């Protein structure tokens, strides 16, 4: 097992104590700068082509409010404080900002992301890897409860990004397994949660071991005094972006889930539903444009009359399809999140999330269709084993309970 660095090596306890005293005595830059630019599409943000490919492949079509405001300043290298509820797309915001700036020819740790829990760190790692799939990003989660030796082996082989919990990351820094020489970006995710768990000292410990010039991003649902202390100590003229949660409601909409276990069982489940229920009009949401086309084809080969619309179609075609759907000449519409906010059909009695949304905030915009104008509606969510975490996050985000679909669902429509 690797030992801690001896006296005289890179980790110098006396120098550490001296730097920590300087840090705690410093008052930092206690002011914010404003940043008002809003980008309505990912294409307008000036991102690398292969990053855009990863974003679209992951299922994002239109940036959320925090992404519209927060990705570009991070990409520009500015220190940022982004305050928004969990589930609004913060993770993809800083992941995109990091992925845009990495030097992929240099296989050294250039970005460090701290998260309060092992589960969140592993979730961030998964998103980072997915968005950076076409860029060849090397990312690793350093968290407690896993093999220290395995962490050391992976770090020695080289990574671009480390995501981790404060305890394990500090341990890796102390052991010199994680060398901060090339580190340019430092992100604190769910900063308020991290501070409430007592990680303040460890965050300070880690920060003062990083290079002097490092870009800092702080992401948090709330901004308690301790979080503001961090911004004062570590950040230079940070851009502050505040996004409030949508003031929409799920009232009057009955929400259920169907445990389909595996992705390949969704189609049979969907067809069974349409054969047993008398549905006036319904909307089916999937996460990618390609899947819209695939599902439309599958439904039509089984003699279901469906319409489909997504962002690759020109506006004129989309308008014609929507007119047909509103008039009732087509009863089933298959679409993506991009169009969720524009479907204002009163007669829609059922929304089916064939895929759960990639961000909890989009759930509201999808199923809100069926409850507009005081009409009641039903939302049915198809849930695979991999979706269970997202279903939990959605229930927590909206403070709702989504029950398993009962056998008498026909009586509810």
Curated annotation (Swiss-Prot):
**Residue numbers of motif DEAD box?**
189-192
Helicase C-terminal domain location, by residue? 252-413
Check the record and name the InterPro entries matching this protein: DEAD/DEAH_box_helicase_dom, Helicase_ATP-bd, Helicase_C-like, P-loop_NTPase, RNA-helicase_DEAD-box_CS, RNA_helicase_DEAD_Q_motif
Q: Where is the signal peptide?
A: none
One CC-aspect GO term: cytoplasmic stress granule
**Molecular-function annotations in GO:** ATP binding; ATP hydrolysis activity; RNA binding; RNA helicase activity; translation initiation factor activity
Q: What GO biological process term is on the record, naming one? A: cytoplasmic translational initiation
What does it catalyze?
A: ATP + H2O = ADP + phosphate + H(+)
Which residues participate in ATP binding? 84-91
* Residue span of motif Q motif: 40-68
What is stated as this protein's family in its record? Belongs to the DEAD box helicase family. eIF4A subfamily.
Q: What does it do? A: ATP-dependent RNA helicase which is a subunit of the eIF4F complex involved in cap recognition and is required for mRNA binding to ribosome. In the current model of translation initiation, eIF4A unwinds RNA secondary structures in the 5'-UTR of mRNAs which is necessary to allow efficient binding of the small ribosomal subunit, and subsequent scanning for the initiator codon.
Q: What is this protein called?
A: Eukaryotic initiation factor 4A-8
């Amino acid at each position: 097992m690797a030992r801690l660095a001896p006296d005289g090596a890179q980790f110098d306890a006396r120098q550490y104590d001296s730097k920590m005293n300087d840090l705690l005595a410093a008052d930092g830059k206690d002011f914010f700068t404003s940043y008002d630019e809003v980008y309505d599409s990912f294409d307008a943000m000036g991102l690398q082509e292969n990053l855009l490919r990863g974003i679209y492949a992951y299922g994002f079509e239109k940036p959320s409010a925090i992404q519209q405001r927060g990705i570009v300043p991070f990409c520009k290298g500015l220190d940022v404080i982004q305050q928004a509820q969990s589930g609004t797309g913060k993770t993809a915001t800083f992941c995109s900002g990091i992925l845009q700036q990495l030097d992929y020819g240099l296989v050294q740790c250039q970005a460090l992301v701290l998260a309060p829990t092992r589960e969140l760190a592993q979730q961030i790692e998964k998103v980072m890897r997915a968005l950076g799939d076409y860029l060849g990003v090397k990312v690793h989660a350093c968290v407690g409860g896993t093999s220290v030796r395995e962490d050391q082996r992976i770090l020695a082989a080289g990574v671009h990004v480390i995501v981790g919990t404060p305890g394990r990351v500090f341990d890796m820094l102390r052991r010199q397994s994680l060398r901060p020489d090339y580190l340019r970006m430092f992100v604190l995710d769910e900063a308020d949660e991290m501070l409430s768990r007592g990680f303040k000292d460890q965050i300070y410990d880690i920060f003062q071991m990083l290079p002097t010039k490092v870009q800092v991003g702080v992401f948090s649902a709330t901004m308690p005094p301790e979080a503001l202390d961090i911004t004062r100590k570590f950040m230079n003229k940070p851009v502050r972006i505040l996004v409030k949660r949508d003031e929409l409601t799920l009232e009057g909409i009955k929400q259920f889930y169907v445990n389909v276990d595996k992705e390949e069982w969704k189609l049979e489940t969907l067809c069974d539903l349409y054969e047993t229920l008398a549905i006036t009009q319904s909307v089916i949401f999937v996460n990618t444009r390609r899947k819209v086309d695939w599902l439309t084809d599958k439904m039509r080969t089984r003699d279901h009359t469906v319409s489909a619309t997504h962002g690759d179609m020109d506006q004129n075609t989309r308008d014609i399809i929507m007119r047909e759907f509103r008039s009732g000449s087509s009863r089933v519409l298959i679409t993506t999140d991009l169009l969720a906010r524009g479907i204002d059909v009163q007669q829609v009695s059922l929304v089916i999330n064939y895929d759960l949304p990639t961000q909890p905030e989009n759930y509201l915009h999808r199923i809100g269709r069926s409850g507009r104008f005081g009409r009641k509606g039903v939302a049915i969510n198809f849930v695979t084993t991999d979706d269970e975490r997202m279903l939990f996050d959605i229930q927590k985000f909206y403070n709702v309970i989504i029950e398993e679909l009962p056998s008498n669902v026909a009586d509810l429509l």
